[in-house]
């Protein structure tokens, strides 16, 4: 397989490296295409699992990289990306909690930081030319490092399939454990795991049991419900079952508690940023419990107009995160608005976990606007029901005038 040598002056490239077939082939392709440039492999540890990192450095060096930087981003990812996004109430197209989307800006930022550290003049990613991630990564690169060249092999090389990649590596005697048959495309981090491809490409196919890897099948989940307590401060989960935990530890504990109950599974067909639709199955056990708890506290503490505003902020934030616009003035504005609203989002919630469901069944807050004295229908001294008559007349004044004018 012939490779065109571009000899463009690129001397050192930082590659977002996973150790999979694509990025294993990218390393020798870069060296051949860009005049034997130096390749620095970079891997972001965002909680995808230790098994994904074992032997990664050795694999990168064997493929031709001169260095491999594995950067631990787990705590920062949850604290500075997941928690702020969840506080806005962001949920894409009503169902997707943005697990993959939220990870892209922190990975891109860390990749740029490694590039600056090693003096690289180019960045490279292995995203396909059909997906969202190419836009997310390159949008972040544009905001953080507009001076660095971006290389996207899937938009440049002539290889079209896994068979092509395997043949390419075999020609160069580069070993890989990958095979031509890859049923699903998966992406995992501390928050979730996504599944695409294979049988899922036909929306008439029900996902088989083999699709799901993180959560139990709700049909096989325990017949006994489990209750979990979450304490929230300023829109952030700080304690689980009374235990004070860091953001990452809290998420991991909730994942471990909720996954056996089949909590957090969704099967959706979403609108990609690039215009096409795609089907994905997502597992987000701990995040689903957190989301339920935060919304329960908001029901107690946010007045009608504040909650409407929070919903608008969440809708904007969902599209912004999905579309890869984290490092923008709009993102800063939305996060600032959310922080203001979250000042009163404090309290405790008990969530019931049962066969795929996470339901907030108890909630209390020192900032609660709910008052039993005001809300009950019995006789009381704090609310005179006669006051409602004047309010209703003023509230419906425009409708009254419109009707009178129509006569």
Curated annotation (Swiss-Prot):
Q: What is its EC number?
A: 6.3.4.5
> Which Pfam families does this one have?
Arginosuc_syn_C, Arginosuc_synth
One BP term from GO = urea cycle
The record's section on InterPro entries has: Arginosuc_syn_C (IPR048268), Arginosuc_syn_N (IPR048267), Arginosuc_synth (IPR001518), Arginosuc_synth_CS (IPR018223), Arginosuc_synth_type_1_subfam (IPR023434), AS_cat/multimer_dom_body (IPR024074), Rossmann-like_a/b/a_fold (IPR014729)
Superkingdom: Bacteria
Cellular component GO terms held in the UniProt record:
cytoplasm
Task: Quickly give the catalysed reaction.
Answer: L-citrulline + L-aspartate + ATP = 2-(N(omega)-L-arginino)succinate + AMP + diphosphate + H(+)
- Tell where it localizes: Cytoplasm
Primary localization class, coarse: cytoplasm
Q: Where is the signal peptide?
A: none
Task: Name the residues that bind L-citrulline.
Answer: 96, 101, 132, 136, 185, 194, 270, 282
Entry annotated with the keyword Amino-acid biosynthesis: yes
Binding site residues for ATP: 16-24, 44, 126
Specify which residues bind L-aspartate according to the UniProt entry for this protein: 128, 132-133
PANTHER family the record matches: ARGININOSUCCINATE SYNTHASE (PTHR11587:SF2)
| Family per similarity comment | Belongs to the argininosuccinate synthase family. Type 1 subfamily.
Name of the protein described by the UniProt record: Argininosuccinate synthase
Q: Which organism is it from?
A: Shewanella sp. (strain ANA-3)
Its lineage reads: Bacteria, Pseudomonadati, Pseudomonadota, Gammaproteobacteria, Alteromonadales
Q: What gene is this protein a product of?
A: argG
